[in-house]
Amino acid sequence: MVTDEARLASICCSTRGVEYRKIYMFEIKDACLTIGRRTIVRHFSFCAPDGQISVVQGAPRSGKTLLLAAMLGFVPLAEGWVTINGEVLNPSTACFFRAQMAYVPQTFSVPMPTTVAQVLDIVSTGWRKYEGRTTIADVQQSWPALALDPQLWQVNFNALTPDVRKRILLSFAVCARHRVLVVDEPTEGQTPEMAAAMMRLIKAEADKGTAVLLTTTSDEVAAEADNTIVLRGAVE
């Protein structure tokens, strides 16, 4: 069950007597998401406006990650639609739109021994860049704030603990210079100090005009949001 189903779904404005619908950078409208015969989310509407932090909050197994997968075009909606900058996301456009987003998944590993530097090379290859290829020097600017050691570049990514992997991926994402930043459970498994550091970095991206979309179980993360919607229920 979703509370506040229509929160920030659509805003109408009037200028010189002409009404128009404000275009948000990231919007999901009247969405229904099902697994088999079970409805996980019903008539869900939400927006992630430019320059703001928007949060989908819920308990573990409430469907947050599944909903995020649908919003990114990985999982089809039973009803409703997702738009990016006013354009509808569908199977033929999903890859194009995802390439314009910086996405940090809840968990991530690579299928073979790969250094952190090689992971950056793999990830950045898929980014649609406006200012050239992202380099180690670009990414490393945020590493002191995230307590990341420069020697990690030559370490096997899969050998690192999940909390360190998440901070590394966030450092990659903020260098992508995309208009949308999506992070699934940004502070999960982090110390309070590191969680606060990550949220400062994320807030700095919103302050630059990026549309930020987060999922979380944390009240502390939700407290940092400009817009929050809560999922209730469970995915079995």
Locations of regions flagged by a protein language model:
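Conserved structural motif at the start of ABC-family nucleotide-binding domains
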Residues: 26, 41-43
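Conserved ABC nucleotide-binding domain
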Residues: 142-159
